[in-house]
Amino acid sequence: MCGRNSLFIEQADLETRFDAEVVADGGYTSRYNIAPGDDLHIITNETPDEIDRYHWGLIPFWADESEEGIINARSETADEKRVFEQAWESRPCLVPSSGFYEWKAPNGGPKQPYRIYREDDPAFAMAGLWDVWEGDDETIPCVTILTTEPNDLMNSIHDRMPVVLPQDAESGWLAADPDTRKDLCQPYPEDDLNAYEISTQVNNPGNDDPRVIEPLDHEQSGLGEFSSG
């Protein structure tokens, strides 16, 4: 799954990287610890030249009241689920990221958080689905992040990972038909990802500053930074 995200690239660099302009109310602020229920900056298929903020958690269209929503959708079965069916059919999006976080519980012990990132790309895109929930008194644009089977790097940490898109597939993801998009939902090549242990500061969403991404001292953490390559 993907239960925590970050995006701390400079706004000008973000706009250049995705050839899109930030239009979100409130502008853009670097975030080191984005939790479910927060807003994610995303790029939708309807406005591929804009970066806007959407509530992280897709709210079922039948919900009578707003709720946190569903933060992840399994790419293998999203088209079969009533809650995602319409979004899968016609509402793909890109979710920019500077790195996501995952927790590993070795031998049933305390969960150890990891930061997973691309060393050669200060911002990459995860695949998502967006929707707009409409209530009696409010309208909430919302998003869920798609997941897939883990690559070899992620397999040692968790049994799922977000769908990370190669840069040359990002525009295709937004424009493709549903069958083609499903073909793009593959584990990202492990040689292009790195991971390292971080402190449990990330466990508290209120900790949202650069200290969150600092590596643990290798002598204390045991595993340290690693990559499958």
Q: What is each PLM-predicted segment?
A:
Residues 1-229:
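Short linear sequence motif anchored by a di-proline
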